[in-house]
Amino acid sequence: MNVTSPKDGNHSFSKKNRFNTNKPRFHKLNEQAQSINLPEDRDSIVSSNTTSIMTDDAFDYNEGIASRTKNINSDSDRSNDTIKQNNYNKRETGYNPFYNGSGINQRYTQFRKREFEPTLAENKAEEYISDEDNVKIDEDNIENELQFTPKIKEASILRSSLLGQRNVLNTRNPKSKESHIKVKPIINNKSSSQRKSSAALRKQLGKPLPLPYLNSPNSDSTPTLQRKEEVFTDEVLQKKRELIESKWHRLLFHDKKMVEKKLESLREYERKRMPPRGTDVSSSEQDNSFKISTPTKSYVSLEQKPLPNLSAMNNFNDVTDNKEKEETNNNILKFQAQRDPLQILQSEIEMHTKKLDTIIELLKDDTDSKEKRKVVTNDNAAPEQMVNKGWRKNVMMIYKKSGNIMKKYREYFLWTICILILLYCNIYVYYRF
């Protein structure tokens, strides 16, 4: 490498004399050469393969650089001014392809052609593609095609659309209506969330009111007044009282007949089983069982307002007699003129409470008589009869216990049956429709 000073441009150093010079002068010359701001030579820039593309022009350019370096080494005695002039001349002539615009465009077009028009070697490589590569290519094509495919609709929407198409076809072809099966429209298109919300609303609102409460207030006022007027009339009271008394007598006679039948059956059974000594005692007690005792207590407090002219209700026989019944009715009618309609109703309620007291006491007397009979039979019965009677008692006790259990759990049993029926109906409706 030749180093020249700016003062003496024509003077040049040889290789032998360069090393013999003084060191300080050599350093000064190097510092002066480095201080000079020379323009960078773009031809000396080396680029990586990633950014540059080798072409024929670049090959020629490399050959020119090699020849130029040889000439520089051979002509070591030349000055730097001549070298710089040559470099500037080369740049002006357009020798460097990186500074020539037409060369860049040519390289760009060639590069694009190589991308879109593969060579023979690439075509041969494509011909020998393996099966796995073909499968991957097919999968990529399927994924690209699936982007444009329509989404699957819900079952309910598809059914409604199909039914609409069938209806349109049936309207166009009326002859084919008879041949095709009639399809029922889908009613329950609600989702589970909508059903739950409707059920929650029904629970909050409760059961629906009957129709009379939904009418207008003007329409409700007239019937209520009419009902009140009907309640406070004497004719209506008489009719209702007659109906109640007729029902009362029917119940009494029916119960009396049933009780008599049961007692007769018990008598016959005991006569067969009992010895002759105990027949008189048992018959006397059984006859006394039919006697009716007077009511001692009532379940409604009647001490504040005692009813007049109700002495005929003291005995059960007086209630059954028609003559005394007519007398009581007449007395009640006479007393109604002196009292308000509310007091009349209260008096009737008290009469019915007394009647209920009589029935309860009759039933108690029957139970007492049965217990006395059992005591007598136990005293006079033989050991074999005692065994039979003990077995009978056990059976009766089991029967009574079972009856009590059924009475207790009857309501629960009925509720379970109702719930099972409702579940069956819901399942049937859900799968049928």
Curated annotation (Swiss-Prot):
Domain of life: Eukaryota
GO biological process: cell division; karyogamy involved in conjugation with cellular fusion; spindle pole body duplication
Predominant subcellular localization, coarse grouping: cytoplasm
A single cellular component GO annotation: half bridge of spindle pole body
Region (Disordered): 1-38, 69-101, 207-227
Sequence positions bearing Phosphothreonine: 233
Subcellular location: Cytoplasm, Cytoskeleton, Microtubule organizing center, Spindle pole body
Keyword field: Cell cycle, Cell division, Cytoplasm, Cytoskeleton, Microtubule, Mitosis, Phosphoprotein
Function: KAR1 is required for function of both intranuclear and extranuclear microtubules. KAR1 helps localize CDC31 to the spindle pole body (SPB), CDC31 then initiates SPB duplication via interaction with a downstream effector.
Subunit: Interacts with SPC72.
The protein, known as: Cell division control protein KAR1
Species for this entry: Saccharomyces cerevisiae (strain ATCC 204508 / S288c) (Baker's yeast)
Gene name for this UniProt entry: KAR1
